[in-house]
Structures are given as C-alpha cells and as structure tokens.
Amino acid sequence: MMKDILDVHTHTIASVHAYSTIREMAEGAKRHGMKLIGISDHGPAMPGTMDDMYFCNFRVVPREAAKGYGIDVLMGAELNVIDYAGSTDLCAKWLSYLDYAIASLHDLCITPGTREQNTSALIGAMRNPK
C-alpha cells in the first residue's frame, strides 16, 4: 500500500471553507506520517478569501511553526483562473513570494465554459512561471 508523504493542496483558516491553522495542519501531517505540506490558500478572486496582500506576507511567515513537528512547509496559492486565456488572480509581484502555485477553475471566479474553453484556460495558466 502506498503512503502519502506530502500534501500541497491544503487550505488554512484564511480560505473560507477551511478550519485549521498552519500549526494544526503540521500536527495532522505528523500524525499521518507526512514529511511536507504546502499551504495553498485561494487567491483573491474567490469570494470570502484574503486579498493579495496576504500572499505578500509569505516572505515572513514563521515556517518554524511547523518545524517542531518535523514537517517542511511550502507556501503557495490556489490561483483562480479568471478568463479563458489563462489569466490568474495574482500579479507577478505576489507570485514571486510563492514557492509554488496551483491553478484551478472555480465557477465562482469564471463562468463555466466549453471543454475547449476550459482546456485553453488551463493551458494558458500553465504558462505562468510558478
């Protein structure tokens, strides 16, 4: 049986539908034998989440909050694709503060398109340097 050693699609209390802090997530990861977690809160186009300045603070997030649990932490974002060209909701400046990014189509941020439009949007988002 395979064992998960990392999870990089996670949300903290900064995302409207999540309930844990970074420290609580590190505790849970340790309990499950993981080695790495990635914090990927939603970008600002998602209603009820943080604005872009939240991601600016990733330069100073105390990653050591998870070190006591033997867990490495990456700071990322779940970017919202906002058009069919693949534009996302964080500018290059804020993206530079991230370790990684996930691009997702959410119907709260973009009107669902055809299969071709959605594919074009995701391919465009993959051109992002993160």
Residue ranges and their predicted role:
Residues 23, 27, 120:
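Short, contiguous clusters of charged residues that form electrostatic/catalytic patches at enzyme active sites
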Residues 35-36, 40, 99:
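Short acidic/polar active-site loop segments enriched in Thr and Asp
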Residues 16-23:
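Glycine-rich anion/phosphate-binding loops
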Residues 43, 47-130:
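Extended substrate/RNA-proximal surfaces in nucleic-acid metabolism proteins
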Residues 9, 29, 101:
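Conserved, mostly hydrophobic/aromatic
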Residues 2:
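Catalytic phosphate/metal-binding cores of nucleic-acid and nucleotide-processing enzymes, i.e., regions
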Residues 26, 30, 126-127:
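Non-catalytic positions within long, well-ordered alpha-helices that form the structural scaffold/packing
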Residues 5-16, 39-43:
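Histidine-centered catalytic micro-motifs
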